[in-house]
Amino acid sequence: MEPTPGIIHDGHNLFKNTVNEYLQELPQPVQSRLYQSPATCLAIYRLLSPMAKFFIMSMIFQDEEVSLRDLDRWVKPDAKFQLHDAIKSMKLLHLITEGRSGQPLMVQLNSIFKESFKNALTGGEVKNSFGNVVEEENDPVTMAMLDSYAADKWETILHFMVGTPLTKSPGKNVLSLLRHSKLMEVDESSKELKITNEGFQFLLQDANAQIWTLLLQYLTMAETFQMDPVDVLNLIFMIGALELGKAYSVVGLSETQKTMLQDLRDYGLVFQKQSNLSKFYPTRLATMLTSDVVSIRSASGAVNSVLRQRAEGVDGKVLNGTALGDDDLQAGGEGALDGALIVETNFKLYSYSNSPLQIAILSLFIHLKTRFQNMVTGQITRESIRRALHNGITADQIIAYMETHAHPQMRRLAGDNLEKKLELDPNCRDTLQVLPPTVVDQIKLWQLELDRIISYDGYLFRDFDNLQEYQVLAQYARDIGVLLWSDDKKKMFFVSKEGNAQVIDFHKRKFRKK
């Protein structure tokens, strides 16, 4: 199994697991308050595994208790692991509780969740859970305008992370969030924010996972500001269930949620007119928060689609009901050539992209040479890789990025080569090698060069009166485990910072002049 391509393709499942883990760790009283919102119940249901969804739909409209043995009978023998995982997840979320009879192995749906989720499915008493739609005014906001706004906000964040020179930077709250989430850190020399290892991993995820990464960090920060986590989560789940292109009133929102709208504007999740803050519009980034259908390959996919429309002169009109191109839908589609990479055995790289964001990401580990209208060329060099490594990006991440964005022809060629090997030797255990092995191995070797150099804080001992004094002190440092390096010929040794005082005290006792 090749782990590297899975970094992106499994991003949708990755963010689901992370959100579920956050929800599972909430105290039960907080979970119960969350389940009072039908929109939140619907969103949580969407985040569950398929088997957990099946169990909930089987129990939602029946009042009798259910035996765990019955659930076990519904599952095939080879799916027992998924069964236990689904039961465990529902128990941690307190979606299922002990039955009223108190008999062992008898369970029932959480009564609060059951009532709210039933209302969400049947259109019952949902109150303000799914927002209050308000009438449009004379100057309506189109979906193309919302896509352009969301792309501009999200593009600003991603460009800032990769260090592209910009005329504008994200707001203070966004910068604080990037630091708090450890996606960026302050460079000791320049005193400016730079991308971290986690930040580059963030760029490898799909848009859903990226947004949830920031929102989960926002939740942890909100707790430090004494913001009610139930209000925060309810608003996040609510905007994920709203209809794109509709205007919604802020009436009915708590003060915490109204404050949140200001922050969500900076992330491109909602749009508000400065002249009328009494209503807001969810953007496409918001409506795909809990979506299982649409998965944009990367945030730059949404950005690039808007850039292409601008270049083609598309104004406020909607293209086939969406402002996102078909090549931006479905993770990893081979039809999406924008940003596709070709890597040669001579370390030359070609990227079919004119996206400033894509080019900026490449510049983190590639020495760019030439830029054409729809393509850039560059060279993978020792210096460019070492620069990336010094910035916290690992060799595996660089390889993963290039494999994930490899041109479909490279994938087909790798597949053909693997088939030929299997024809000659059916027992061959080689895996699909999309990138040239020489390039992959060399990038890993360049990382090993840096890994060989390890720095320690400590003290150097030298200029001894005689060989015996050197040998006794060096042996003592070795015996107590503080000796880091020694050179018998030069009569020098190096001890750790913590062991320096012990060595000095021993020298005073052993060699003090009488």
UniProtKB/Swiss-Prot annotation:
Component of the general transcription and DNA repair factor IIH (TFIIH) core complex, which is involved in general and transcription-coupled nucleotide excision repair (NER) of damaged DNA and, when complexed to TFIIK, in RNA transcription by RNA polymerase II. In NER, TFIIH acts by opening DNA around the lesion to allow the excision of the damaged oligonucleotide and its replacement by a new DNA fragment. In transcription, TFIIH has an essential role in transcription initiation. It comes from Eremothecium gossypii (strain ATCC 10895 / CBS 109.51 / FGSC 9923 / NRRL Y-1056) (Yeast). GO terms for biological process: nucleotide-excision repair; transcription initiation at RNA polymerase II promoter. GO terms for molecular function: ATPase activator activity; double-stranded DNA binding; RNA polymerase II general transcription initiation factor activity. It is found in: Nucleus. Belongs to the TFB2 family. Keywords: DNA damage, DNA repair, Nucleus, Transcription, Transcription regulation. Pfam families: Tfb2, Tfb2_C. This is General transcription and DNA repair factor IIH subunit TFB2.
